[in-house]
């Protein structure tokens, strides 16, 4: 059933331009990728009851990493991103989520480069396929194509304006939902740092990849708390 919906997604949703990669240079050379073994006791082959699309606010991630060679492709002087895709994650009942469902060989370099401006880290792409993608698809290209379609379908608010305006988590969630048709604030989860800086936005989806109210227990920042948004002003 899940793979039937998965195949339908690939057919039904068109491709679109990447709006969040303000400046992305795909590296000629990639780090060597290795098969990632699941941590002990973490293999969970359980039924999929929904999905999370996790979007990372890159300016916050890069705030103290601009001199780190390991993050140069995302945070270096020639790289500028808004929201990047952290991952597409299958979910199970009672927060027991599918994970590490099969063997994940090192990704092909061409596939990594194809999706690099969506997720500008070869190692993160490898990890997402190993931990989450193997529970959704039989091949990595199908998993990342679905993730790319969903990512490209998301509309993003004016982050500079929201940052300067000063908003609560609840107001931000409402604005994010307002510009995405069919979405309500209850379908969005906001993740923050200990200092209440925006870290991630997570969109809850059903098994047909449509936004749904997030299940009880999904973590999110309190709606009345002030939300700080770091801006990349380079």
Where are these regions (language model features)?
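Bacterial N-terminal signal peptides that target proteins for export
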Residues: 1-6
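A generic structural micro-environment signature
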Residues: 7, 59, 91-95, 135, ...
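C-terminal, well-folded lobe of enzymatic/effector domains
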Residues: 20-23, 27-34, 110, 121-234
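N-terminal signal peptide c-region/cleavage motif recognized by signal peptidases
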Residues: 14-16
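Betabetaalpha-Me/HNH-type nuclease active-site subdomain
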Residues: 37-121
